[in-house]
A protein has these predicted regions:
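Interhelical loop/hinge segments that connect adjacent transmembrane helices in multipass membrane
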Residues: 1-16, 190, 202-243
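Membrane-interface helix-loop junctions in multi-pass transport and translocation proteins
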Residues: 7, 165-199
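Residue-level recognition of pore/gate-forming positions within transmembrane alpha-helices
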Residues: 21, 29, 56-59, 94, ...
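Helix-terminus/linker motif at the lipid-water interface of multi-pass membrane proteins
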Residues: 30-49, 111-118, 174-181, 241-274, ...
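Small-residue-rich hydrophobic transmembrane alpha-helices
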Residues: 48-102, 138-157, 265-309
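Alpha-helical transmembrane segments of multi-pass membrane proteins
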Residues: 103-105, 118-141, 279
């Protein structure tokens, strides 16, 4: 599973790493758009608004998680490049600890952030209640993906999200169509498919030899490790979070203008999110390749990575 990014053609390494990541990001975007599209095919405007508002909150949480995971990817990659698997194990364990703390602190404030039209309140509450059950699985998926990417493997996370995306579409059609569960069906499809992606990811870790041996000691908070993860991951999370805050402000304004405006804005925001696929892919690629090369004492290759990207 581990891929050495410190030798060979830098340009080839960028393409090999970036393309699977780009496809993964596209599938994640498709994941959210599928909920809205299928809901729109079988339900009314109130259900579309409920799913749009609920998914906006979930996307905000996901952006925070993915941003922090970037810090983990860099620290793991640096440790792998230096051949120090003990530091990589500490980074993985402390990432799990950090994510759990962030989720506990962030969920309630985000839920109370947006004002939902009265007609869509029941559906939004139902959607979020079920999706919150899936938050640990979102976290687990991103932690496992950051481990794979830190080891230089961006293909495995792509396979994990592809399985989840296919399952989500199939379950959405079943739950929202024949079973007529509306927003509840969309949330169930999302949560169950996220659970499946984590199961597949755990199987991937078990099947491949990573050279990592995690123990309880690795999960103990270490100030130095957490500091390095946050130093890199927090600015990324804040940067992407600010973009999502802008979207949420637009959502709040649309919510106060009525049901139809709220639904329309929710759909457009899903389309706009697709525009961030390429820059986000390049950010992840530069982070993974540079961290391994800096860890291996090859700053010139890290500089070449930035130049080519």
């Amino acid at each position: 599973m581990e891929k050495n990014l410190t030798t060979g053609s830098v340009f080839k390494a960028i393409l090999t790493f970036a393309l699977p990541y780009l496809l993964s990001y596209f599938l994640q975007t498709l994941y959210g758009m599928a909920d809205l599209y299928i809901t729109g095919r079988f339900c009314g405007v109130d259900s579309i608004t409920a799913v749009a508002n609920g998914s906006q909150v979930m996307h905000m949480l996901t952006v925070i998680i993915v941003g922090l995971a970037m810090g983990s990817t860099v620290i793991i990659g640096h440790a792998v490049g230096a051949g120090n698997m003990r530091d990589a194990e500490d980074a993985i364990g402390n990432t799990v600890t950090l994510f759990m703390a962030v989720l506990v602190a962030a969920v309630r404030p985000l839920v109370g952030l947006i004002g939902v039209p009265a007609e869509a309140v029941p559906g939004t509450v139902q959607y979020l209640t079920i999706c919150f059950i899936g938050i640990p699985f979102i976290t687990a998926y991103n932690i496992i993906s950051s481990v794979f990417r830190g080891l230089g493997d961006s293909k495995s996370p792509m396979y994990f999200i592809a399985v989840a995306c296919a399952a989500n579409i199939a379950l959405d059609i079943l739950f929202i169509g024949p079973m007529a569960l509306g927003p509840v069906g969309a949330a169930l499809g999302t949560t169950l498919s996220q659970t499946l992606s984590v199961i597949v990811a755990l199987f991937g870790i078990w099947r491949h030899k990573t050279g990592l041996r995690l123990s309880r000691q690795n999960f103990r908070p270490r100030k130095g490790v957490l500091g390095r993860i946050l130093k890199i991951g927090l600015p990324v999370a804040v940067q992407d979070g600010c973009i999502q805050v802008a979207f949420i402000i637009i959502t709040i304004i649309a919510n106060h203008r009525g049901l139809i405006d709220s639904a329309a804005v929710g759909i457009v925001e899903k389309i706009i999110s697709a525009m961030f696929i390429v820059p986000s892919s390049m950010l992840a690629t530069v982070s993974a390749l540079s961290s391994q090369n800096l860890g291996a004492g090859k700053p010139e290759r890290a500089a070449q990575t930035l130049k080519y990207a």
